[in-house]
Amino acid sequence: MADLLSSLKNLPNSSGVYQYFDKNRQLLYIGKAKNLKKRIKSYFSIRNNEITPNHRASLRVQMMVKQIAFLETILVENEQDALILENSLIKQLKPKYNILLRDDKTYPYIYMDFSTDFPIPLITRKILKQPGVKYFGPFTSGAKDILDSLYELLPLVQKKNCIKDKKACMFYQIERCKAPCEDKITKEEYLKIAKKCLEMIENKDRLIKELELKMERLSSKLRFEEALIYRDRIAKIQKIAPFTCMDLAKLYDLDIFAFYGTSNKAVLVKMFMRGGKIISSAFEKIHSLNGFDTDEAMKQAIINHYQSHLPLIPEQILLNACSNETLKELQEFISHQYSKKIALSIPKKGDKLALIEIAMKNAQEIFSQEKTSNEDLILEEARSLFKLECMPYRVEIFDTSHHANSQCVGGMVVYENNAFQKNSYRLYHLKGSDEYAQMSELLTRRALDFAKEPPPNLWVIDGGRAQLNIALEILKSSGSFVEVIAISKEKRDSKAYRSKGGAKDIIHTPSDTFKLLPSDKRLQWVQKLRDESHRYAINFHRSTKLKNLKQIALLKEKGIGEASVKKLLDYFGSFEAIEKASEQEKNAVLKKRN
C-alpha cells in the first residue's frame, strides 16, 4: 500500500484518465476526471497513513477500492480529450469493474442527392458533404428492404452509372426505368417520380400499401413465388419500428435512450423519432458480474453512438436516468463533436416523458423475457470449474489448419449470447513455420486489433498447454484482461491419440488440467466451441488449397514448374503478388541461385 499512498499524495490537478490495478497488476477500473486529484481522492479515506474506501461510496465501489494496490494517470489537455480517451481505453483493455457495451455500429441511412439531374435512393453510413442531399433514418434494420421495394415499385434510374453509359439497358426493356440516359424522360418528369419516392420513404404505410397491391396482382396471375417475396418484404418493413403507434402532433426529432436492469444484468433500448414519428428502434443486453452502474453505462452508450459523425443529429436526446454531472459532460461532448448545441435531458412530464416510459416499458419486457436457460447454467458451472473471474458471455475460439506447413491459415469464431455470431468470424493467412508459431501469429494479430474490436471475456484455444502459455504471454504484453482455456486430445507416445471412439479431450487452464467424462455438459460446451472453430479453419484451408492449385495450374500453363512456383512464392509471398509482378521481376527471382 506504500506505493498507493505515495501516488495519492502526489496527484496532479490536471484533466486526465486514471487506472486502478490490484496487487497482481490486473486492471480493475478506468475513469476520467476534470481534476484528477479531486476525483481520485473521492474514492478513498486516509487516516494515519491508512487507506480505506470512502464510506459514502456504493458497495460496488467499496468492493473495488479494497482491491486497489496501484494507480496510474494519463494527463490530457482538457475534459473532452479525457472523455474520449477513457472510452477508447475501456473498449481496448476491458477492465474488470467497467461496464462494457458493444461498439455501436453506425446505423444506415437512406439518402437522395437532389443536386443531381436524376436523384436515386441509396444507403450510406457516412456524411456526404454536399448540398442537396436529403437523409432519412437511422434504420436499425430493413433499410435494404425499403430500397429494394422502391426500385421495384418506381421507374427510377436503377444504377449509379446508368446516365454516363448513354445507352438504355435491360431495366428499360422490362419497364423498370424510363431511360433518361437516352433522353426518353425529361428532368421535370423524373423529378415527379423522385418526389413520389420521397413520400414512400417518409410514409411507411403508403409503401406497404403499394407492396400489398403488387403482391395481390402477382397472386392473381398465379406467380406465387414472386408474391411470397413481397409478403416477406412487407413483414420485414412492418417490423422496422414496433412503436409506430407513437405519432406526436409536434414534429420532434429525438433520440431516446433507456436502461432497465438489476445489479448484474440490464437492457438498453434505443428509439429514434423523426418528424414526430418513431422510425426505428434497437436494444442491447448487458451483463456485469461486478455490479451495474446506470450512470457509467449511459455515458458509454452515448459516446459509442455519437463519436462517429452521423448524417442526422436530433434536436434533443432523451435519457431515462443520468447524474447532472454526467449529463453536462455528455452535452458538452456532443455539442463539441457536431459544432452545435444539442440538448440532453431527463423528461419529467408531457410527451417526452411518455416516450421515455414507452422505452422503459419495452426494456422491462425484454428483460423479463431473458429467462435463465440451460446454456446459462452450463456457463455458470464452467466458470466455477475453470475458476474464471468473469462469466464467459463473449468467447473467441481459435484454430489453425495447414498441410505439411503449406497453405497455413487460422480462424477465429465468436460465441456470444448463447449463439455463434457469424458476422464476427475472422480468417487469417499465416506464415508460421510450425503449429506453435502459427498460433502465436494468429493470437498476436487478434490482440493487435483490440483497439478496433474490444477483447472478449474468454479465449478458447484448440491446442495444449504450450498454446495456452503462448496465449497468456500475448495477453500479458497487450495489457488486456482476457481469460484463457485450451482443449486438446490426450497424447500417447507424445502424439495426439485420435482413433475413432478412443480420443479423449483434455481441458487446460492456467492452474489445472481437467479430464472430464464425455457426458459432462461443461466438456460438451467447450467441445462445441472447438468443433466450430475447427470446421471454420479447415474449410478455409481447403478453399485456400484449391485456389492455390488452380493458380499453380495457371502458372504451369505459362511454363513455370512447381520448383519455380515455390521460389516465386517464397519471394513474393502470395499468388496475388506474383500476378502483379512484372515478367522482368519474376525472371530476376528465378535466375537467382539459392
From Swiss-Prot:
The GIY-YIG domain, residue ranges: 13-99
Every UVR domain range: 205-240
Coiled-coil regions listed in the entry: none
Keywords for the protein's UniProt record, in alphabetical order: Cytoplasm, DNA damage, DNA excision, DNA repair, Excision nuclease, SOS response
Signal peptide start and end residues: none
Superkingdom of origin organism: Bacteria
Pfam family, one: UvrC_RNaseH
Chief site of localization: cytoplasm
InterPro entries, per the entry: GIY-YIG_endonuc, GIY-YIG_endonuc_sf, GIY-YIG_UvrC_Cho, RuvA_2-like, UVR_dom, UVR_dom_sf, UvrABC_protein_C, UvrC
PROSITE patterns noted in UniProt: GIY_YIG, UVR, UVRC
Compartments, record wording: Cytoplasm
GO terms classed as biological process: nucleotide-excision repair; SOS response
GO cellular component: cytoplasm; excinuclease repair complex
GO-annotated molecular function: DNA binding; excinuclease ABC activity
Assigned protein family: Belongs to the UvrC family.
Subunit structure: Interacts with UvrB in an incision complex.
Matches recorded under PANTHER family: UVRABC SYSTEM PROTEIN C (PTHR30562:SF1), UVRC/OXIDOREDUCTASE (PTHR30562)
Biological function: The UvrABC repair system catalyzes the recognition and processing of DNA lesions. UvrC both incises the 5' and 3' sides of the lesion. The N-terminal half is responsible for the 3' incision and the C-terminal half is responsible for the 5' incision.
Name under which the protein is recorded: UvrABC system protein C
Annotated organism of origin: Helicobacter pylori (strain P12)
Top-level taxonomy: Bacteria, Pseudomonadati, Campylobacterota, Epsilonproteobacteria, Campylobacterales
